[in-house]
């Protein structure tokens, strides 16, 4: 039985109506909310950097130098430096494991696995200073967490405990027939009851959901849950999941309590069911990442330090494969192997259902570290994978802009897109919907809005997300804000002129911390400011465009760069040459998009999106956009189908419409 992969955009609390106690309040559980619980409104989207300024950069050399200067012993690990804990009583060396403090080599952030104390590099320095003065460092519960945050965490733990007590092990259901029917519904018929019991999996009848526990590694206390609901779609099973606490605070490495201290090998999977199937078939230690192929939180790296070999088997599509390569960078590629998706190498649960040899698939995993020079023999399988999965190679498809899919084919990592349009044409409004479309499909997005502030941008995006004017329906605000908050969306707090190095450092930090794969910079001129002379300004712009191009390539991250056009005659259509500055921007770009306003003469106020450059396969063309003021959307989402016109990429006058105003001929360069 085939399985449809999970999508990172979760439907918060909407699939468990039987367990709701009323309308969902902010921070309250949708399963155990009782009557009389006061609704709280809180909108808080992640922003980068912290309000105090850019994230402080620290190198591993500086960290080592500081530890030596303070007389703190340490060992070099794969992703972290290991040191004795500073957050408990000083113990003699033989009293327990001495190195329980893990310091991230990239960011300097730390986690003490003995006390669960965590923080940034500056917090660690402060703890060292307190230690030298004889003052105990604050424990994990004595930090400066917001009162509302603490209350929300307590509610989540209490709600998780209630659900856990109501759930039953599958082996304790009424009869074998109910157990078989439940397993069949989730596509896990081959999984033995013993495997499910070993991992602590339970079943919640009221919601028809599997329950996966999150136990604290220190004291085995229940910290949260993940609930999984299955839906039959033909021969396939589609899964929807929900977590307590909410998704961005859920850091459960499912299967961690079963890992022994001497285990030196582990397989990371994209779902709990895959971990169960793989462990049953091979006996190899397996862990499921809490957010699948979407993100590997750096806070989990300390728990993976003990393993000399890490195999990533995250799924059966190209996005999982790309995520595996990205995660291997964090984990240290030298110890990582990757299972490449293919017909004979599907996700572990499907492989078990099909009777494939999972041990053989693991042995065929490819090393993540590449040499500087390779032969075609080493690339052969990857080339075949791209040919066999051409639709996935084309990238993530837009749901709101199907016409854009016909031209660009999809949104791909590692590319640079330049977007321009006349002043006042709605560039920010369009590009926010363009990016939101991808974000709702699990593309981790970082916004750098240098022209308008984040509150105004978030208001635009929330309106587009809800496709309605929330000003007139404030009673729906909490519901839509809850859903919007679950998106993998982050904002830089910069506004106006900024130094390019500071911006790039923040982007690099976001890629590492949140596995960002799409960065939107709106816009280049506002980021640069107006201080330089005209000649210096053009050179500075070329340098910045080149820096963004290099960043996109080095980090396998797509950058969408909004640039104002030159001042030209309003009656003329914009062209690729209309982009402000030298030709550097259009030369470096993989894609050039132009928002045309009233230029293709089908009526006043009409706008068109023109693809004037497409390096992926050369298709260029134009299609109309219709703006809805109520929902602030340009897409044909729920509207009549827009007409697409493909054109040849050549110099000369713009294509003219046919006699009927319909679609003209199409051709490919």
From Swiss-Prot:
UniProt comment concerning the protein's domains: N-terminus enhances protein stability and hexamer formation, which is important for DNA binding, and is required for DNA helicase activity and, ultimately, for mtDNA replisome processivity.
Catalytic activity: ATP + H2O = ADP + phosphate + H(+); Couples ATP hydrolysis with the unwinding of duplex DNA at the replication fork by translocating in the 5'-3' direction. This creates two antiparallel DNA single strands (ssDNA). The leading ssDNA polymer is the template for DNA polymerase III holoenzyme which synthesizes a continuous strand
Subcellular location, record wording: Mitochondrion matrix, Mitochondrion nucleoid; Mitochondrion inner membrane
Function summary: Mitochondrial helicase involved in mtDNA replication and repair. Might have a role in mtDNA repair. Has DNA strand separation activity needed to form a processive replication fork for leading strand synthesis which is catalyzed by the formation of a replisome complex with POLG and mtSDB. Preferentially unwinds DNA substrates with pre-existing 5'-and 3'- single-stranded tails but is also active on a 5'- flap substrate. Can dissociate the invading strand of immobile or mobile D-loop DNA structures irrespective of the single strand polarity of the third strand.
Protein name, UniProt field: Twinkle mtDNA helicase
Chief localization: mitochondrion
Enzyme Commission code(s) on record: 5.6.2.3
Species annotation: Gallus gallus
Compositional bias annotation for Acidic residues: 141-151
One Gene Ontology term of the molecular function aspect: ATP hydrolysis activity
């Amino acid at each position: 039985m085939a399985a449809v992969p999970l999508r990172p955009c979760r439907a918060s609390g909407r699939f468990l109506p039987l367990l709701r106690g009323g309308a969902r309040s902010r921070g309250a559980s949708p399963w155990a909310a009782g009557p009389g619980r006061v609704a709280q409104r809180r909108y808080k989207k992640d922003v980068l950097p912290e309000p105090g300024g850019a994230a402080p950069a620290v190198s591993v050399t500086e960290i080592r130098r500081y530890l030596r200067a303070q007389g703190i012993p340490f060992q070099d690990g794969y992703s972290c430096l290991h040191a004795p804990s500073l957050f408990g009583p000083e113990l003699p060396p033989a009293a327990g494991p001495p190195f329980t403090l893990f310091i991230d080599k990239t960011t300097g952030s730390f986690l003490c696995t003995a006390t669960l104390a965590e923080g940034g590099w500056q917090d660690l320095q402060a703890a060292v200073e307190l230690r030298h003065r004889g003052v105990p460092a604050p424990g994990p519960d004595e930090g400066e967490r917001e009162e509302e945050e603490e209350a929300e965490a307590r509610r989540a733990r209490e709600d998780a405990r209630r659900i856990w007590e109501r759930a039953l092990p599958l082996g304790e259901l009424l009869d074998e027939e109910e157990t078989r029917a439940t397993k069949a519904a989730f596509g896990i018929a081959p999984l033995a009851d013993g495997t499910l019991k070993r991992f602590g999996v339970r079943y919640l009848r009221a919601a028809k959901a599997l329950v996966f526990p999150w136990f604290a590694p220190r004291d085995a206390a229940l910290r949260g849950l993940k609930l999984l609901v299955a839906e039959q779609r033909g021969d396939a099973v589609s899964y929807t999941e929900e977590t307590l606490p909410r998704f961005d605070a859920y850091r459960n490495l499912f299967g961690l309590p079963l890992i022994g201290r001497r285990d030196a090998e582990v397989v990371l999977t994209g779902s709990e069911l895959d971990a169960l199937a793989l462990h049953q078939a091979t006996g190899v230690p397996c862990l499921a990442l809490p957010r699948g192929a979407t993100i590997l939180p750096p806070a989990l790296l300390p728990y993976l330090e003990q393993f000399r070999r890490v195999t990533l088997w995250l799924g059966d599509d190209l996005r999982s494969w790309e995520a595996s390569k990205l995660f291997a960078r964090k984990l240290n590629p030298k110890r990582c192997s990757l299972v490449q998706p293919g017909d004979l190498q599907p996700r572990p649960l499907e492989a078990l259902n099909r009777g494939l040899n999972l041990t053989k698939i693991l042995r065929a995993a490819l090393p993540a570290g590449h040499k500087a020079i390779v032969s075609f023999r080493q690339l052969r399988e990857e080339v075949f994978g791209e040919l066999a999965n051409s639709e996935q190679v084309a990238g993530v498809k837009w749901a709101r802009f199907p016409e854009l899919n016909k031209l660009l084919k999809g949104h791909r990592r590692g590319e640079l897109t330049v977007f321009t349009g006349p002043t006042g044409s709605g560039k920010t409004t369009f590009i926010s919907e363009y990016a939101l479309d991808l974000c709702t499909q699990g593309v981790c997005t970082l916004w750098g809005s240098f022209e308008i502030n984040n509150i105004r941008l978030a208001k635009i995006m929330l309106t587009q997300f809800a496709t309605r004017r929330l000003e007139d329906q404030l009673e729906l605000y909490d519901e839509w804000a809850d859903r919007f908050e679950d998106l993998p969306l982050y904002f830089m707090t910069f506004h106006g002129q900024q130094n390019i190095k500071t911006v790039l450092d923040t982007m690099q930090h976001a890629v590492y911390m949140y596995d960002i794969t799409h960065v939107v910079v709106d816009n280049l001129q506002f980021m640069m400011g107006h201080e330089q002379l005209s000649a210096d300004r053009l050179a500075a712009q070329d340098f910045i465009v080149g820096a963004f191009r290099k960043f996109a390539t080095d980090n396998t991250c797509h950058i969408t760069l909004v640039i104002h056009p030159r001042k030209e005659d309003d009656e003329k259509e914009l062209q690729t040459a209309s982009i402000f500055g030298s030709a550097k921007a259009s030369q470096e770009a993989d894609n050039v998009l132009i928002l045309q306003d009233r230029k293709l003469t089908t009526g006043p106020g009409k706008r068109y999106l023109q693809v004037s450059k497409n390096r992926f396969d050369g298709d260029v063309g134009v299609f109309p956009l219709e703006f809805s003021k109520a929902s602030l959307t340009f897409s044909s989402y729920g509207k009549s189908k827009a007409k697409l016109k493909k054109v040849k990429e050549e110099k000369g006058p713009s294509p003219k419409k046919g006699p009927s105003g319909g679609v003209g001929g199409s051709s490919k360069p």
